[in-house]
C-alpha cells in the first residue's frame, strides 16, 4: 500500500485529508510557512537580478555629480551604461586557436 492511499485519497469533491490532526495549530502554521516560502522563492527567481543589484549598489543611482561639468557627467553615464550592457549579456564568445 502506498503512502498516498494512506494519507490522501481522491474524492468527488477533490483531495481530502484523512489526518485527524489537520486542525492542529502547528500543522496550520507549518502550511502557512511553506506557502510563504514558496511565494518568496518564486519572487526571488523572477526578480533576482533587480533585487541583488539593488542590494549590491544600494538605493542610490551612483555617486553624486554635483559640481561636475556636464561633459564629464555624460562620459560617466556612458561608462555606466556600457558596464550594465556587458553585465546583462549571458554568453561569452571564446575563440580557440
From Swiss-Prot:
Lipidation sites (S-palmitoyl cysteine) = 50
> Membrane as a keyword?
yes
Task: List this protein's GO terms for biological process.
Answer: protein complex oligomerization; symbiont genome entry into host cell via pore formation in plasma membrane; symbiont-mediated suppression of host autophagy
Q: Which residues does the UniProt site feature Seems to be involved in pH gating point to?
A: 41
Instruction: Name positions with the PTM Phosphoserine.
Output: 64, 82
- Positions on the Virion surface side per record topology: 1-22
Stated name of the protein: Matrix protein 2
Q: Which organism is it from?
A: Influenza A virus (strain A/Duck/Germany/1949 H10N7)
Amino acid at each position: 500500500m502506498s503512502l498516498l492511499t494512506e494519507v490522501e485519497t481522491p474524492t468527488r469533491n477533490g483531495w481530502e485529508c484523512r489526518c485527524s490532526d489537520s486542525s492542529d495549530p502547528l500543522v496550520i502554521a507549518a502550511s502557512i510557512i511553506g506557502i510563504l516560502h514558496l511565494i518568496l522563492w518564486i519572487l526571488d527567481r523572477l526578480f533576482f537580478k533587480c533585487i541583488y543589484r539593488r542590494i549590491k549598489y544600494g538605493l542610490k543611482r551612483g555617486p553624486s555629480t554635483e559640481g561636475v561639468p556636464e561633459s564629464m557627467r555624460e562620459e560617466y553615464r556612458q561608462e555606466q551604461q556600457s558596464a550594465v550592457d556587458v553585465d546583462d549579456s549571458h554568453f561569452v564568445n571564446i575563440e580557440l586557436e
